[in-house]
Regions:
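Beta-strand/loop motifs with alternating small/hydrophobic and polar/acidic residues, enriched
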Residues: 1-145, 572-578
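Eukaryote-biased RCC1-like beta-propeller repeat architecture
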Residues: 142-578
Length: 578
């Protein structure tokens, strides 16, 4: 637990940049405030680990106050860092947390309360360790554990996870260059390019400060949120901007933003679509972002495979501001369409889909391996939204895969719910489509029914090479997954299965989803999945190389083959999580 808390502090304490500080004095007081908040975060974590009981200070067994270099009993640990932040010969920050002002001792967890008082300090030094001046700030936080815990939404990009917690956005995982990519990304949105296996708060800008966070998506190396303030909705994006996927009018090799930037609305006659609260949904895939505004679909970013749904693949190559996708023509979106939902997933794919009010699905973009579901493959992609073949009464759709790099394409696929049943198409070689497929590589070019799923499908989510569905089986909600399981993506607690064409039940019980709670919703992406339960706690499984699971561990040796509670995803009203 101590290692986890140290990591938690590292994620909690991110120095704000000078551009947001009006004077040096304000800067140091701001740092003192943040150091104090890091102390309240530490106290929260210690309370969590000790059943809401104070373990430091003057209580039995307590050694002293909480400081960065102490454990939860207040005892100094030589292996811990002495300061929250140490800027060498300039300044350093620390905190001290004393006894709780309202004790939680002998109080039921469902009603426990505490007043945490933390003193944050900034010590200005002369380069030799001598303190020249000290700035202090006292931070007091009321902490509660009510029975009704706030709901949360999680999304998974490539090697990172993001969540909406108490109307703030938090991300964790990779935040810089990855593998062969030569460009810095900043996809955690906290103003740095430092990766973190604990949540860091995405910088709140514009209407993110005072408005409501309505929606979020995480694509390959960028993310976006939809906000509403004073009945006006806006979109903010951060991360990689090589192809204009942030929508702020800028793009180019090496372009990125480590803090959210506002998406520029279209101009001219189309500007009205983005006015007021007309934006109803956002979504993204690979290096493209999309939104539904006034019932119409707009996209911005890369168009190499037609994923803008505008013009021909590669013409234009990209757009740094929203463009309305094409409509009209045989088997395409009708001119008078009204969109209701964008496809989820898509951390690495070059395909997008939309559901209309007629409950029909239309897809566009990369089509080489049948992932559009239109009955024919097409190497160069489709720049027009085309109807998915033979599906009626479509209520949900999700897509993901590897086509951003061109290989391995056989893992690219799409799944949808039609009339309560799950259908999948596209790449099928690892079982992700629920049946083997044909050709080389194995694929389905039109929807195929996934067998072995009991009851009525409520939600479908896909990752790079696996799929999951939430089923209502005679009144009981159950999660099933199929496809690649080498990293634990199926959550079935089965290390003996590498690939499965047959849906496997996600593990339920002491080492899985709690049997006493209902599954409320799913989220998936890349090589993992998550389920939100009726007690509003989240459980995730699969790849954990960058700490994406959220249980305080990281590294491929900590991949989870069974659902594991994501402690970071336990927001509570009036409770601060860092």
């Amino acid at each position: 637990m101590s290692t986890f808390i140290l990591a938690l502090l590292a994620g909690a304490m991110r120095v704000v940049t000078q551009s947001y500080i009006y004077s040096q004095e304000e800067y140091y007081y701001k740092l003192a405030q943040e150091a104090g908040e890091a102390g309240t975060a530490y106290a929260n974590a210690c309370l969590d680990s000790n059943g809401a009981e104070q373990s430091w200070g003057s209580v039995p067994g307590g050694i002293g106050p909480l400081r960065p270099e102490t454990n939860c009993k207040g005892a100094v640990n030589p292996s811990y860092e002495k300061y929250v932040f140490d800027e060498g010969n300039k300044f350093r920050t620390t905190f001290e947390v004393g006894d709780l002002e309202a004790s939680t001792r002998s109080t039921a967890l469902s009603a426990a309360t505490a007043q945490i008082s933390s003193i944050g300090r900034v010590e200005i030094t002369n380069g030799s360790g001598v303190v020249l001046k000290t700035y202090t700030a006292v931070v007091k936080k009321s902490v509660t554990w009510p029975a009704d815990i706030d709901a949360t939404r999680t999304v998974s990009g490539t090697y990172r996870t993001c969540a909406i917690l108490s109307n703030n956005v938090w991300c964790w995982g990779n935040n810089d260059k990855y593998e062969s990519n030569e460009y810095t990304m900043g996809q955690l949105g906290d103003g740095t390019t430092v990766s973190s296996n604990v949540p860091v708060k995405v910088r709140s800008v514009g209407d993110m400060r005072n408005g409501k966070i309505i929606d979020i998506f995480a694509a390959q190396f960028h993310s976006c949120v939809l906000t509403e303030f004073s009945s006006v909705r806006k979109i903010y994006c951060w991360g990689n901007n090589q192809f204009g996927q942030l929508g702020n009018g800028d793009f180019g090799d090496g372009k990125y933003s480590s803090v959210p930037v506002e998406v520029k609305p279209p101009t001219g006659a189309l500007a009205a679509d983005f006015a007021g609260n007309n934006i109803s949904a956002i979504g993204g895939t690979g290096d493209v972002s999309c939104a539904i505004a006034a019932g119409k679909v707009y996209c911005w970013g890369s168009n190499t495979m037609g994923q803008l749904g505008y013009g021909s693949p590669g013409s234009p190559k990209s757009s740094a501001t929203p463009v309305r996708i094409n409509s009209g023509g045989y088997s395409r979106l009708p001119n008078n369409y009204s969109a209701t939902k964008l496809s989820t997933g898509g951390s690495r794919s070059q395909t997008m889909c939309v559901i209309t009010t007629e409950k029909r699905a239309y897809c566009w973009g990369q089509a080489r391996f049948g992932q559009l579901g239109i009955g024919v493959p097409h190497y160069s992609g489709y720049g027009n939204a085309t109807r998915v073949k033979d599906l009626e009464d479509v209520t949900d759709i999700s897509q993901d895969g590897y086509t951003w790099s061109g290989s391995p394409d056989y893992v690219t696929h799409t799944c949808a719910i039609a009339a309560g049943r799950v259908y999948c198409w596209g790449g099928a070689g690892r079982g992700q489509a629920g049946s083997p497929g044909s050709g080389t590589p194995k694929k389905h070019i039109e929807p195929r029914l996934v067998g072995g799923l009991p009851g009525v499908a409520l939600q479908v989510e896909v990752g790079i090479a696996h799929s999951c569905a939430l089923m209502n089986d005679a009144g009981t909600k159950k999660v099933y997954c199929w496809g690649d399981n080498r990293l634990g993506q199926l959550g079935a607690n089965r290390t003996d299965i590498q690939y499965s064409f047959t849906p496997q039940p996600v593990n339920v019980g002491p080492n899985g989803l709690p049997a006493s709670e209902r599954v409320v919703s799913l989220s998936a992406g890349a090589n993992r999945g998550c389920a939100i339960m009726s007690d509003k706690r989240s459980y995730c499984w699969g790849l954990n190389d960058n700490g994406q699971i959220g249980d305080g561990t990281s590294g491929s040796e900590n991949n989870r083959f069974s659902p594991t509670e994501s402690l970071f995803l336990r927001p509570v009203q009036n409770r601060y999580i860092y």
